[in-house]
């Protein structure tokens, strides 16, 4: 797919702020950012309250999505330009939503809010409202979504890409460093997964790297282009960014996202993989009464214990 089919530049965006049938939509991790200022004429989607089911941990359904877009003044035939902060990670999340429910004309503003601000382009604090429409969402296209059983069946069969940070992947931490409250239930990663942090696909200004750079990034990490791919993180915003890169920019057709099905969602019969140091640290944190016969650092330093037989990682299960 050509980049112009899924991306617009900041120059194009500024020239088309008032174009008919073009709607700019801001979706941010920081849901208050839009309220401070935004691209003139852009409307807001709140990823927490607008895109999440209020009762269960799932997406809004087609009826809810139709109601949402109708109330915000978006029509089926509109071209929707999505943007946000932090390299467009939640904008990519919303992009995936629009594709899930069959919206044909949707693109990302390359570089998002970061590039727009770096360029010194104008922002507005004026409230925005649009006339109500009668939007009709299509039934969900679940071919771009992977469910739990599909993830379990994919272990050592398909490409599994863990797009979180290396420290989350190894089990050292349970959440993004700047969001310590957003913890997974289990440390580590799904066995067989490769780690390609989502943010490596972006340049310093938030724009996407070239196709050549992106292809090399995933090839160097061990992505097998002949296999289907499932990307995962924790909530889905980071894996949506990777899904956009692989499918919309690089043209990989069999790419799915597993929302909420990282290592923390695997049943007791599945495993998370983590390094030994992290394992013992997590073990003693969970069970304070547990005492090791010898400090693990001492075992490691003396060359004894598990490291002495070449074991540097463990497959572990955690109680749910």
From Swiss-Prot:
Per the UniProt entry, the Enzyme Commission number(s) are 2.8.1.1
Please name the catalytic residues of this protein: 233 (cysteine persulfide intermediate)
Which SUPFAM superfamilies does its entry note?
Answer: Cytochrome P450, Rhodanese/Cell cycle control phosphatase
Q: What is the lineage of its organism?
A: Bacteria, Bacillati, Actinomycetota, Actinomycetes, Mycobacteriales
**Source organism (scientific name):** Mycobacterium bovis (strain ATCC BAA-935 / AF2122/97)
Name the InterPro entries for this protein. Answer: Cyt_P450_CS, Cyt_P450_sf, Rhodanese-like_dom, Rhodanese-like_dom_sf, Thiosulfate_sulfurtransferase
Keyword Methyltransferase in annotation: no
Function of this protein? Answer: May be a sulfotransferase involved in the formation of thiosulfate.
Protein known as = Putative thiosulfate sulfurtransferase 2
Q: Does the keyword Transmembrane apply?
A: no
Q: Which residues form the Rhodanese domain?
A: 18-125, 154-267
Q: Name one GO molecular function term.
A: thiosulfate-cyanide sulfurtransferase activity
């Amino acid at each position: 797919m050509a980049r112009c089919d899924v991306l617009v530049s900041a120059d194009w965006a500024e020239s088309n702020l008032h174009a008919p049938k073009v709607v700019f939509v801001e979706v941010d991790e920081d849901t208050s950012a839009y309220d401070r200022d935004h691209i003139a004429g852009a409307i807001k989607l709140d990823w927490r309250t607008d895109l999440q089911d209020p009762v269960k941990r799932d997406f809004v359904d087609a009826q809810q999505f139709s109601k949402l877009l109708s109330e915000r003044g978006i029509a089926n035939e509109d071209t929707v330009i999505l943007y946000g902060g932090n390299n467009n990670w939640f904008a990519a999340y919303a992009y995936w939503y629009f594709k899930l429910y069959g919206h044909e004309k949707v693109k990302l503003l390359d570089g998002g809010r970061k590039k727009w601000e770096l360029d010194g382009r104008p922002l507005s604090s004026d409230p925005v409202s649009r006339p109500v429409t009668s939007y009709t969402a299509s039934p969900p296209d679940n071919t771009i979504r992977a469910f739990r059983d599909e993830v379990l069946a994919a272990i050592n069969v398909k490409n599994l890409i863990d797009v979180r940070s290396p420290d989350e992947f190894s089990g050292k931490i349970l959440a993004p460093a700047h969001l310590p409250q957003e913890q997974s239930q289990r440390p580590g990663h799904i066995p067989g997964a490769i780690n390609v942090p989502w943010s490596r696909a972006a340049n310093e200004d938030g724009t996407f790297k070239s196709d050549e750079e992106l292809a090399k990034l995933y090839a160097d990490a061990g992505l097998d282009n002949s296999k289907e791919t499932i990307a995962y993180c924790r909530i889905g915003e980071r894996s949506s960014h990777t899904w956009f890169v692989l499918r919309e920019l690089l043209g990989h057709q069999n790419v799915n996202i597993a929302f909420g099905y990282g290592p923390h969602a695997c049943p007791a019969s599945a495993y998370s993989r983590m390094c030994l140091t992290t394992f013992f640290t997590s073990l003693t944190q969970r069970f304070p009464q547990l005492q090791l016969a010898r400090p693990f650092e001492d075992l490691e330093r003396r060359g004894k214990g598990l490291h002495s037989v070449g074991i540097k990682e463990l497959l572990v299960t955690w109680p749910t």
